[in-house]
Amino acid sequence: MGKEKFHINIVVIGHVDSGKSTTTGHLIYKLGGIDKRVIERFEKEAAEMNKRSFKYAWVLDKLKAERERGITIDIALWKFETTKYYCTVIDAPGHRDFIKNMITGTSQADCAVLIIDSTTGGFEAGISKDGQTREHALLAFTLGVKQMICCCNKMDATTPKYSKARYDEIVKEVSSYLKKVGYNPDKIPFVPISGFEGDNMIERSTNLDWYKGPTLLEALDQINDAKRPSDKPLRLPLQDVYKIGGIGTVPVGRVETGVLKPGMVVTFGPTGLTTEVKSVEMHHEALQEALPGDNVGFNVKNVAVKDLKRGFVASNSKDDPAKGAASFTSQVIIMNHPGQIGNGYAPVLDCHTSHIAVKFAEILTKIDRRSGKEIEKEPKFLKNGDAGMVKMIPTKPMVVETFSEYPPLGRFAVRDMRQTVAVGVIKNVDKKDPTGAKVTKAAQKKK
């Protein structure tokens, strides 16, 4: 074995009929971890149901169906390998929880693959005012997915087939749209493909010999691997806290930024409780250091389980320790709220692992979501499709950070009526120092 390949996450976005499932299914099918026997079973079933055309999408549909029925599917099925990377496909956006997942940081994508239906009528439907293509691209950009690959799909079904004129027209239109969202289209490869026939997916297609750019596989290899934020101060949002006999209190969570090591003195925001980390474990093995992306449990000295809760954030007490937010200002995009949102609105915020009601204390401005420029000062309300700057006050102590400093703790979903009604990124935080915070003896010795 040479050097381990880097892992990257890609999110596949696009209009509902653009061919996301077929294209993703094709990659997983050709490059991925699906057992050949499973595929043969799927193919046989598809043939029996006269769904031959649906071969690759069928693979994905079966996986989704099995997952939704609660049959745990080995997540390797959603992975495939390129020459340079192990790629994991993050939930395709048809999935209800996609937006919430994308925001609460269960999955930060390194790159978005935008699939476009190049057929007559298909493209127009996807990019129209209410098409999902726009919303997905905007969401990806707002949530910090800075790299994108565009696939002009269904090139085998354009008129005439594999039409360069159609491709050029789409590139021009999509580029101007992506530019408004905030992407630089010059940095985005536009790959003409057929997810079904396989043109330009992995091998270069003779049907598209007018195109000189990369195939989809080559474009994936050109993604810049994410700089993992291990040089930032520690932020580890707690998912759970356990009491383990003979060991004591063990908080569990994923390192988002920084490094966690045994012997470190940590401060838990928002309460300011400070103690020493005795040991750090991942998959029942002791670690000398835990890095961003690691899901770990760590043992803390002289701390009762009741003093820590899900949503608290562990940080290094000597390096910008986490504190509660008195208030914070966010840029919010209203996505599916049936009415109007005015001052005093109090929904629930899902930010990292915390789930807390906040008050929209003051809608400061309404902004143009394309340019980010202010359109109106102190508007009375925001409605569907609007973007604005809002001052928010948490109803209980909570830790949030600015998106620019700590991205996973600076983006959130606004939940109301059992759905995501808005998404946002935090621009600044007014932090408050904890009063009467407990510092354990172990931590005092280390001072």
From Swiss-Prot:
Residue numbers bearing the 5-glutamyl glycerylphosphorylethanolamine modification: E289, E362
SUPFAM superfamilies: EF-Tu/eEF-1alpha/eIF2-gamma C-terminal domain, P-loop containing nucleoside triphosphate hydrolases, Translation proteins
Family annotation (InterPro entries): EFTu-like_2, G_TR_CS, GTP-eEF1A_C, P-loop_NTPase, T_Tr_GTP-bd_dom, TRAFAC_GTPase_members, Transl_B-barrel_sf, Transl_elong_EF1A/Init_IF2_C
Ligand binding (GTP): 14-21, 91-95, 153-156
Positions of modified residues (N6,N6-dimethyllysine): K55
Region span, G2: 70-74
Cell compartments where the protein resides: Cytoplasm
Tissue spec. comment: Was detected in all tissues examined but was most abundant in roots and salt-adapted cultured cells.
Chain residue ranges for the region called G4: 153-156
Residue positions, PTM N6,N6,N6-trimethyllysine: K79, K187, K306, K396
tr-type G domain boundaries: 5-230
Record PTM N6-methyllysine, positions in chain: K261
UniProt entry keywords in alphabetical sequence: Cytoplasm, Elongation factor, GTP-binding, Methylation, Nucleotide-binding, Phosphoprotein, Protein biosynthesis
Annotated region (G3), positions in chain: 91-94
Region G5, residue ranges: 194-196
Top-level taxon of origin: Eukaryota
CDD domains for this protein: EF1_alpha, EF1_alpha_II, EF1_alpha_III
Region called G1, residue ranges: 14-21
A cellular component annotation (GO) from this entry: cytoplasm
An example molecular function term from Gene Ontology annotations: GTP binding
Listed GO biological process terms: translation; translational elongation
Protein family (similarity comment): Belongs to the TRAFAC class translation factor GTPase superfamily. Classic translation factor GTPase family. EF-Tu/EF-1A subfamily.
Purpose: This protein promotes the GTP-dependent binding of aminoacyl-tRNA to the A-site of ribosomes during protein biosynthesis.
Protein name as catalogued: Elongation factor 1-alpha
